[in-house]
Amino acid sequence: MFNITNIQSTARHQSISNEASTEVPLKEEIWNKISAFFSSEHQVEAQNCIAYLCHPPETASPEEIKSKFECLRMLAFPAYADNIQYSRGGADQYCILSENSQEILSIVFNTEGYTVEGGGKSVTYTRVTESEQASSASGSKDAVNYELIWSEWVKEAPAKEAANREEAVQRMRDCLKNNKTELRLKILGLTTIPAYIPEQITTLILDNNELKSLPENLQGNIKTLYANSNQLTSIPATLPDTIQEMELSINRITELPERLPSALQSLDLFHNKISCLPENLPEELRYLSVYDNSIRTLPAHLPSGITHLNVQSNSLTALPETLPPGLKTLEAGENALTSLPASLPPELQVLDVSKNQITVLPETLPPTITTLDVSRNALTNLPENLPAALQIMQASRNNLVRLPESLPHFRGEGPQPTRIIVEYNPFSERTIQNMQRLMSSVDYQGPRVLFAMGDFSIVRVTRPLHQAVQGWLTSLEEEDVNQWRAFEAEANAAAFSGFLDYLGDTQNTRHPDFKEQVSAWLMRLAEDSALRETVFIIAMNATISCEDRVTLAYHQMQEATLVHDAERGAFDSHLAELIMAGREIFRLEQIESLAREKVKRLFFIDEVEVFLGFQNQLRESLSLTTMTRDMRFYNVSGITESDLDEAEIRIKMAENRDFHKWFALWGPWHKVLERIAPEEWREMMAKRDECIETDEYQSRVNAELEDLRIADDSDAERTTEVQMDAERAIGIKIMEEINQTLFTEIMENILLKKEVSSLMSAYWR
């Protein structure tokens, strides 16, 4: 790329061979030959790219030329993508082939400049030295370094990007004029940025653009660089050494340069396509996140100062035997680890190695660990000696058959008893009963152990789906059997088959009307593929523990059916029934909230029993039509009569107070509105967009920000971070207020017009 620092990146027209035809401009000649490569939707953007390539700006670099070719290739129909080539016959040679594979335009870069050939014409450009340009440019050195570069950058913009580049330049000018240290260029749709930005800028924010690369010669004194949610495929090795914090999450980066900024302390590369890390990462690095990439191995020696390492969701089969000695947080879940290093860092506080294939843990773990997650592995035992500082341990979904003998005597150093979660493991009934007995004793002071009810040692054979359905619909015709047999190829059909068999063993089958209810529901599923898909998904984890989890899953399926009916128009002509359906969903959400409160206060109870217990016991008092009558383990739910009385009162009060606002924002009601009042809906949405796009939204955000009076901190970066967090939170709040106002207004108008507004009055007396 042309180096602005030493040789100014401008060019001059040097020679022309074969006079240009005055009849048809080159860009039109080329376009006439390749217009068929592009759909009507992409024609304008493709034409702009061709115009650029036929007459590149003076500051054109190989990277910029390549980006235009990449853009054309992306816009073209797949059948013509290979007619647009770059790096052809060399890193800096680009060309376009006609439909019959004849070269009609080429651009070749060399050390002296570049040559454009097309339509029998050849134009060569050479670079101009900085002194040559300076002699012809008016203004100060600042004008050359900034205004000239920025104006050329704006001129190069594709049509749809030009206005946003102008906006970016205005922001840079504002920073330059007012000596601001933060430059925010996010959500502008930028495909490039100028290499030169105001030198006082220390924080550069480029999030949510369309950048495919960063400048090779990015200048300035940047300390913080954010370029999340772009289309970056690589990182230049020449980024300023001043950078201390860099976030490049949600891009397409495949590899890192061997050299990163030497001052780098924090690097976040979440959700990219990186397969390996450089051996020599910056020694100043303290925070490293490569969560959700494709990394197979880590460097043997990571920087010794790293305190937080996140390598979650990669393809690691092992961790380095020697990890940074000061490491406090290690997140390595969702990999293919089979073991951990024999010796872990002595100051480790958080260790997450969930969703791996680990069969055994080190017998001695660092005593400083407060949070340990080893769930979803292949462990058969837990260590006898747990870390002294342990506050919570998640070991669900392993192959544990016993608990450490020392567990009841473990005393953690924390203010609360340690919580050890071992749900969905194949414990024997004796192990569960012994743990229950120990924890129920008056003088027990050990950890709180939580596991799911039910016998995990029983292996249930999953029948073909059509056979499971026949258990409920005994009079099925052969045609119906074949229909359900065809459904067996659908995703999660086997899970639903197992669910149906298990449902037949629940307490609810004692009631004849329950079987009729399920039979009618199954006939509905046979006719509705979308509802069937939703129900099959819910069935995925329905049979992993006890009978009551199956019943709870059935409740969730009935709730999903109710919502599905509302969204698909079943209540469009029956708004009274829709409002009653909404009231039931509201009550169920309130029950879930209260159940979560109860679970937090319990010592040793399966949360399934608490959730189902409230639903089951409040079925009649709250008129819950989708709930079943019975459950098996209510006696161990920990729910008291006073809990039920309090829950009933709180839910009824909440419904009288809040249902009006809740219903206005309910998604299924919005679907109904779009169908029964399309004009009013469009007007309301237009009004909502206007609130956001005009000054009203930002003015309200600014007013609340000003009321907060965020004090200046001695740490300017910290003040900026607090300011940004506050602005984000206020923006969400203002948006929720706008939604509530507009959706409530349209709801009241439509219900009044339909003469059912009285149904929104307080329900409970």
Curated annotation (Swiss-Prot):
It catalyses: S-ubiquitinyl-[E2 ubiquitin-conjugating enzyme]-L-cysteine + [acceptor protein]-L-lysine = [E2 ubiquitin-conjugating enzyme]-L-cysteine + N(6)-ubiquitinyl-[acceptor protein]-L-lysine. Its EC number is 2.3.2.27. The keyword Secreted applies. Ubiquitinated in the presence of host E1 ubiquitin-activating enzyme, E2 ubiquitin-conjugating enzyme and ubiquitin. GO terms for biological process: negative regulation of protein binding; protein secretion by the type III secretion system; protein ubiquitination. SUPFAM superfamilies: L domain-like (SSF52058). Binding to TXN is inhibited by hydrogen peroxide in vitro. Residues 452-461 are annotated as: Linker. LRR repeats lie at residues 200-219, 221-242, 243-262, 263-284, 285-305, 306-325, 326-346, 347-368, 369-389, 390-410. Residues 464-758 form the NEL domain. PROSITE patterns: LRR, NEL. Keywords: Host cytoplasm, Leucine-rich repeat, Repeat, Secreted, Transferase, Ubl conjugation, Ubl conjugation pathway, Virulence. Changing residue 546 to A: Loss of ubiquitin ligase activity. Residues 462-765 are annotated as: E3 ubiquitin-protein ligase catalytic domain. Effector proteins function to alter host cell physiology and promote bacterial survival in host tissues. This protein is an E3 ubiquitin ligase that interferes with host's ubiquitination pathway. Can ubiquitinate both ubiquitin and host TXN (thioredoxin). Leads to significant decrease of thioredoxin activity and increase of host cell death. The LRR (leucine-rich repeat) domain forms a slightly curved solenoid and may mediate interaction with target proteins. This is E3 ubiquitin-protein ligase SlrP. It comes from Salmonella typhimurium (strain LT2 / SGSC1412 / ATCC 700720). The gene is slrP.
